[in-house]
């Protein structure tokens, strides 16, 4: 089992000032039965995370946008009030997994992959903009612990959130609050 929730590394960043410019809705995610997010091929068992990837990834993307100076708020997928915000970010998680396998000898490799498609919509945009971001992480050790699984998944999820925010900023879909 993968313990805990996904989180951003602690940073000393003041929240963006002003009215929210972006709302980040929960991302869609087709969850596997019983929270399975991967496989331990060495011990022939599933890897389970009881978290909610769609909400966790939306939290991470909103967090990165906030760290970048964008006044962003989080709402559920069907939350009311999103119409009043200039840009709505939504999307779907295409891949969210962590697997382990022995690579010969004493080494065990833990690999995590996250793929996210973000869609930006709003009255100020010429039309919906869609970007897909994927990242993978690989860790090697003598044995794997639940914390190793979490670290691989958290590192990969944060890298995807950072890249998604970077692409939104570069495309000038969102911008830091002044």
Where are these regions (language model features)?
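A structural "domain/chain start" motif
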Residues: 1-60, 168-178
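Generic detector of contiguous secondary-structure segments
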Residues: 6-14, 72-82
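Structured segments of extracytoplasmic/periplasmic soluble domains
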Residues: 30, 60-71, 96, 159, ...
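Short acidic, glycine/proline-rich loop/turn micro-motifs
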Residues: 35-41, 101-104, 142-146
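Generic short beta-strand segments
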Residues: 26-32, 92-99, 134-136
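Surface-exposed short loop/turn segments
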Residues: 1-2, 75-128, 139
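Short secondary-structure boundary motifs at beta->alpha junctions and helix caps
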Residues: 43-52, 121-173
């Amino acid at each position: 089992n993968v313990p805990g929730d996904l989180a951003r590394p602690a940073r000393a960043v003041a929240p963006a000032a002003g009215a929210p410019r972006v709302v980040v809705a929960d991302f869609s995610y087709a969850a596997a039965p019983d929270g399975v997010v991967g496989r331990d091929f060495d011990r022939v068992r599933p890897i389970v995370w009881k978290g909610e990837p769609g909400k966790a990834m939306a939290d991470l993307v909103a967090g990165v946008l906030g760290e970048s100076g964008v006044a962003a708020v989080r709402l559920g997928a069907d939350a009311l009030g999103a119409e009043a915000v200039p840009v709505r970010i939504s999307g779907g998680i295409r891949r969210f997994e962590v697997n382990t396998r022995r690579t010969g000898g004493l080494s065990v490799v833990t690999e995590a992959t996250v793929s996210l498609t973000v869609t930006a919509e709003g009255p100020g945009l010429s039309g919906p903009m869609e970007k897909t971001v994927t990242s993978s992480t690989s860790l090697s050790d003598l044995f794997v612990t639940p914390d190793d699984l979490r670290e691989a998944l958290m590192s990969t999820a944060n890298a995807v959130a950072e890249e998604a925010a970077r692409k939104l900023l570069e495309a000038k879909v969102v911008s830091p609050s002044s």
